[in-house]
Amino acid sequence: VLKDAASAALYGSRGANGVIIITTKQGQQDSKATVKVKATLGGSSRAVRDYDRVNTNLYFELYWEALRNQYAKSSDYTPATAATQASKDLVTKLMGGGPNPYGTQYPQPVGTDGKLAAGARPLWNSDWSDAMEQQALRTELNLSVSGGGKANQYFFSAGYLNDKGIALESGYQRFNLRSNVTSEMTSWLKGSINLSFAHSMQNYPVSSDSKTSNVITAGRTMPGFYPIYEMNTDGSYKLDDNGDRIYDFGSYRPSGSMANWNLPATLPLDKSERMKDEVSGRT
């Protein structure tokens, strides 16, 4: 810390309140080589819990009510026939030609009273938000070697950081190297060289609120009765020739329900990366 005349002599009026000089790590004179290793492991998660959402049963009942009210406005329907038509059209309106989440046993899962049929239960409940999140582990490793003799001091360090984000295919990696060597060549001549290098890679999915590729918005928007994977009528997964599950892109979904879209399937393919190399030196 430089204060008063010392700071004024170097920095003028800008140093009137004092100057703090930050120096990089360096080796100690007349010291044996010291090796330090530091490893940390941690994780991160969402600090604020997401909104509560309606489940499949309540969603179907509310949508039935909306259909019934829509039909009841028309002179072609009485209150009773509007309720009957709403029950008939409910699955088609929500699922198009896709699978009925209540199975073939319940072609009309909501009755004319607007209540779920007795015994009806969803055969699946897809958690789109969970499918687009990952374990956000943070790993950091640092190694340093320092020491020196009467005339020379040295400090070398290397570091690695891998910080995964909570969103699928998001994260940050960094590799860094640093060296600081000081040599007293004569009683009146002293030299030093300080070099550093850092290589970083950042992966980040699109985060604009208006885009369906926003993992947070998409997870909140997609109801659980739209399956992530193709389903059989009994609620089991359809499998390909290798026995793997098949992503459901929802070509049957009605307009406004993100037809032909499956972000958990496409996120690993839609790379959004930023790489940066930084080199600096000082003598």
Regions found by a protein language model. Give the residues of each.
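A beta-strand signature from Gram-negative outer-membrane beta-barrel systems
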Residues: V1-K36, E133, R138-E140, Q153, ...
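C-terminal beta-signal and adjacent terminal beta-strands/loops
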Residues: S45-R46, D130-M132
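Outer-membrane beta-barrel transmembrane strands
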Residues: Q134-N152, G159-L161, P268-T283
